[in-house]
Amino acid sequence: MEYSQMIFRGLFITKLSYSLTCFIFFIYFNHSNAQNKILEEINSPVIFKGDERTAYRDPAVLFHNDRFYLFFTLVKNESGKIFSYTACSDSSDLRKWSQVKILTPRDQNLNYCSPGNLIRYDEKWVLCLQTYPRQGYNSGDKVRYGDANSRIFIMKSNDLENWSNPELLKVKGPTISEDKMGRMIDPYLIEDKDEEGKWWCFYKQNGVSMSYTYDFINWNYFGNNESGENVCVLKDENEYTMFHSPSNGIGIKRSYNLKDWNSFGSLITLGQKDWDWAKGRLTAGAVVDLRNIKGIEKYVMFFHGSGPNKETEGDFDKNSSIGIAWSSDLVNWEWPNK
């Protein structure tokens, strides 16, 4: 090979390598930059807006493969009757969401709703939820809550798209029949922080009640603690952090052993005083810890707000919306357009 040809090839390879390096850096930079702006580019704290015939409530969130999967209660006024469903939508940027998909049947005697959270168990996704029977509940009736037959269930999926039929969780133990379990709502599942394979179910009954299992079939009742509803529990180092909803706002408690709980911080009400859509009540905080996700690096909270009227005044099955906020420390919270 002539010397001039060798020089030419060397220059060509050098330029090609440089171009590839620049291209890879460009792709990485733009991806990272886009990730960094996910929270900054949300232009409204409202993710799903309710109206006079629709309510979005009780959010549950999963962050998986760079996507947010949001599950929630969808309440609809259909032909003068009020129905509750479990529904879902997903997004990569928290601004553009997929079409809402209803996962549960239209049946006032069941009203599957209030999804708590999703876990990964036995190579499947598991979603916990409740029934909320309100048979004969019509538009214009006084606000009615789920009756004494409200129970908690799980559904399973391989792909987050197709779900099994709901299965009852007999969280009071195998010897307690379904009709003796008592009214229970708002389930949440979490693996024990110290014992792998031991799973806890938190649910609203006598404050917050707790049961545990090793197989999701045989359950042991553990006890209860003073708490509001819509419990969400995170494991943070050697501690459990529980978010719960009293009559208004979102409270936080912490515990090392699930028996002794101490209040943490102040009641969280975010921008409620300035939000007509949440002036009636702000509640049901579902928090996901994304501090280790590059470009997000926050706790992200989804919640629902009802308004402008109080829920007892009618804005329970209508005019309820899902909102978003985030924090680095669970004390100071930010939201779009703050």
Q: What is each PLM-predicted segment?
A:
Residues 1-35:
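Bacterial Sec-dependent N-terminal signal peptides
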Residues 34-338:
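Carbohydrate-active catalytic/glycan-binding domains of CAZyme proteins
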